[in-house]
């Protein structure tokens, strides 16, 4: 299961902003109850989306019952994730402290590294926050995600080449509706971006406005950019 920052089912996660949380420390070194954190991640993920596990910056990583857990914060943004048998923490999403309410996301971990995909062309270069790079190497996953070199084709009404996997994600998240809005999470647009996620991948002229205000080509390009940099695990249903 993987937490992220964008969607209804969308990885509540289309949202990706990275940070450095300092030196990693085992849970026992910080006086953290591993069993309690593991149970909270498995059975009450909403509470982890609403608030960090403790005040200030922290970087807690541990293995409990053959499952890896990671909880990080730089004092302003916080992330958490878990996955079975992973030697590295899954790609992580961040949430901005008092604002976004995020939903849990299933950890999608393939047995091979995801092939790099060619980024779709963009009319403007936007600055994207630095993101922690992690390699997914686990051989077991909650769902089987196969990023084969699937054929890419432009979405109807858009000149951006969107691979078939990302097209399927858009159908699950919004049915392809550019104006779709999730009333509970605030995720919006064809790919159900949270606002903080959208601002990290959208062109500068569309940052700070709802994804629903952007044309399909802009939404497609932003989703491709997020998919190529952070992977399909940004969507819960991916």
Curated annotation (Swiss-Prot):
Subcellular location: Secreted
SUPFAM superfamilies in the record: Lysozyme-like
This protein's record includes keyword Signal: yes
UniProt-annotated stretches for the region Disordered: 82-161
EC number(s) on file: 3.2.-.-
Hydrolase is among the record's keywords: yes
Family annotation (Gene3D superfamilies): 1.10.530.10
One of the record's GO cellular component terms: extracellular region
Chain intervals with Low complexity compositional bias: 89-156
Signal sequence extent: 1-27
Primary location class: secreted
GO MF assignments: hydrolase activity, acting on glycosyl bonds
InterPro entries: Lysozyme-like_dom_sf, RPF
Keywords associated with the record: Glycosidase, Hydrolase, Secreted, Signal
Stated family: Belongs to the transglycosylase family. SceD subfamily.
Functional description taken from the UniProt entry: Is able to cleave peptidoglycan and affects clumping and separation of bacterial cells.
Name of the protein described by the UniProt record: Probable transglycosylase SceD 3
Organism: Staphylococcus saprophyticus subsp. saprophyticus (strain ATCC 15305 / DSM 20229 / NCIMB 8711 / NCTC 7292 / S-41)
């Amino acid at each position: 299961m993987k937490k992220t920052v964008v969607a209804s089912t969308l990885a509540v996660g289309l949202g990706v902003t990275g940070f450095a949380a300092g030196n990693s420390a085992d849970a026992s070194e910080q006086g953290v109850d591993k069993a309690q954190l593991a149970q909270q991640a498995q059975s009450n993920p909403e509470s982890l989306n609403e608030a960090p596990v403790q005040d200030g910056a922290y970087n807690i990583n541990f293995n409990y019952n053959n499952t890896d857990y990671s909880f990080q914060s730089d004092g302003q943004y916080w992330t958490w994730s878990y996955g079975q048998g992973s030697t590295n923490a899954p790609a992580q999403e961040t949430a901005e402290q008092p604002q976004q309410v995020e939903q849990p996301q299933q950890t999608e971990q393939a047995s091979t590294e995801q092939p790099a995909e060619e980024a779709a062309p963009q009319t403007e270069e936007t600055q994207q926050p630095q993101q922690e790079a992690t390699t997914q190497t686990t051989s077991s996953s909650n769902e089987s995600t196969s990023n084969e070199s699937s054929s890419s084709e432009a979405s109807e009404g858009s000149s951006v080449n969107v691979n078939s996997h990302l097209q399927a994600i858009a159908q699950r998240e919004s049915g392809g509706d550019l104006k779709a809005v999730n009333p509970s999470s605030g995720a919006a647009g064809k790919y159900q971006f949270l606002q903080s996620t959208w601002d990290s991948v959208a062109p500068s002229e569309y940052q700070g406005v709802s994804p629903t205000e952007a044309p399909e080509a802009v939404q497609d390009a932003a989703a491709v950019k997020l998919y190529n940099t952070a992977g399909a695990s940004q969507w819960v249903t991916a």
